[in-house]
């Protein structure tokens, strides 16, 4: 069954099929805490994005991705910056398929029983990065709780093959939490470490049960701290969303926890609900508040903080890495 058909089956209320990619209501219907619709808040004037156009590299990149059977989180997660990033010739590659084993109700990536790993994916990824002549790439993935190493070995193979094909390219990875597999995953990752290690905290601990079912706040902090202990020369990075119902003080507390766990780089952006079946936006954070978060981040000792309404963890990642001291992050 094709991806298009399985997605359609999951969305139209057909009999439950664990192999189908579930999106929107089909995905969130089975989580422990139900998503309660709320009044839709009007988007403020400062929420603006640029659409891709045929005059940019937007369609060129999409065609190359399809040719090599690759996915991007830009597309799967409906990122609002896709037009700008594709237009500039940058993308965040999503490996290990397009079906996640988690059901996070803020995220637009589909849920379902994942397909077996594609053994050709690392080579296809390396060829694509070389063909696009990218100097900085971000590699992320769905959660793969079905794999004994959580997918760490596949990450390492992608890193190795990309470096073999494009030795000057800098590689950032945005990894899942490797729940229950941290020791094994870290042992594997340190054999071919990335140039930047990113794992998103996403939200404040009070909202974890609602927003990140299956995840643990302290576990995520520990993952980044332990990686830094194992590979001290690689900067660590994490990101937060605002607008899920947290307070400013709670965000500042998470930032302090990040620094206490030796996290170097920070991103904070506005949460935008992908659909009416996802968690609702509880507030739109004013630019002045984002500026306050940025100021406080540097006071706390972050080497770089990308903070703003349209910031996402991979947005302008090359510039973030360059400013944080990663050599060659900008070609």
Curated annotation (Swiss-Prot):
InterPro entries: Aldolase_TIM (IPR013785), Elp3/MiaA/NifB-like_rSAM (IPR006638), LIAS_N (IPR031691), Lipoyl_synth (IPR003698), rSAM (IPR007197). One of its GO terms (cellular component) is cytoplasm. SUPFAM superfamilies: Radical SAM enzymes. GO terms for molecular function: 4 iron, 4 sulfur cluster binding; lipoate synthase activity; metal ion binding. Keywords: 4Fe-4S, Cytoplasm, Iron, Iron-sulfur, Metal-binding, S-adenosyl-L-methionine, Transferase. Its main location: cytoplasm. [4Fe-4S] cluster 2 binds at residues 100, 104, 107. It is found in: Cytoplasm. It comes from Leptothrix cholodnii (strain ATCC 51168 / LMG 8142 / SP-6). The lineage of its organism: Bacteria, Pseudomonadati, Pseudomonadota, Betaproteobacteria, Burkholderiales. Binds 2 [4Fe-4S] clusters per subunit. One cluster is coordinated with 3 cysteines and an exchangeable S-adenosyl-L-methionine. SMART domains: Elp3 (SM00729). The keyword Membrane does not apply. This is Lipoyl synthase. Gene3D superfamilies: Aldolase class I.
């Amino acid at each position: 069954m094709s991806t298009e058909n399985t997605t359609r089956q999951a969305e139209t209320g057909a009999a439950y099929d664990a192999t189908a990619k579930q999106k929107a209501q089909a995905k969130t219907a089975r989580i422990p805490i139900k998503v309660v619709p709320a009044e839709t808040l009007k988007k403020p004037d400062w929420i603006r994005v640029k659409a891709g156009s045929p005059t940019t590299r937007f369609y060129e990149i999409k065609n190359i991705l399809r040719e090599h059977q690759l996915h991007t989180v830009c597309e799967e997660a409906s990122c609002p910056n896709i037009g700008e990033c594709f237009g500039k010739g940058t993308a965040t590659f999503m490996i290990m398929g397009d079906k996640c084993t988690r059901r996070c109700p803020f995220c637009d990536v589909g849920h379902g029983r994942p397909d077996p790993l594609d053994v050709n994916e690392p080579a296809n990824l390396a060829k694509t990065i070389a063909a696009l002549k990218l100097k900085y790439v971000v590699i992320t993935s769905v959660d793969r709780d079905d794999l004994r190493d959580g997918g760490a070995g596949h990450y390492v193979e992608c890193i190795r093959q990309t470096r073999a094909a494009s030795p000057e390219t800098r590689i950032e990875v945005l990894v899942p939490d490797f729940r229950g597999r941290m020791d094994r995953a870290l042992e594997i990752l340190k054999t071919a470490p990335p140039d930047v290690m990113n794992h998103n905290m996403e939200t404040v601990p009070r909202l974890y049960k609602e927003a990140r079912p299956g995840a643990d706040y302290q576990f995520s902090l520990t993952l980044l701290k332990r990686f830094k202990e194992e590979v001290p020369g690689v900067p660590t990075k994490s990101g937060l969303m605002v607008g899920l119902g947290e307070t400013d003080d709670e965000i500042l507390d998470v930032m302090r926890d990040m620094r206490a766990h030796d996290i170097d780089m920070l991103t904070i952006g506005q949460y935008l609900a992908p659909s009416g079946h996802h968690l609702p936006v509880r507030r739109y954070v004013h630019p002045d508040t984002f500026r306050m978060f940025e100021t406080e981040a540097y006071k706390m000792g972050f080497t770089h903080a990308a903070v703003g309404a349209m910031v996402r963890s991979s947005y302008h990642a090359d510039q973030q890495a360059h400013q944080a001291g990663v050599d060659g992050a900008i070609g």
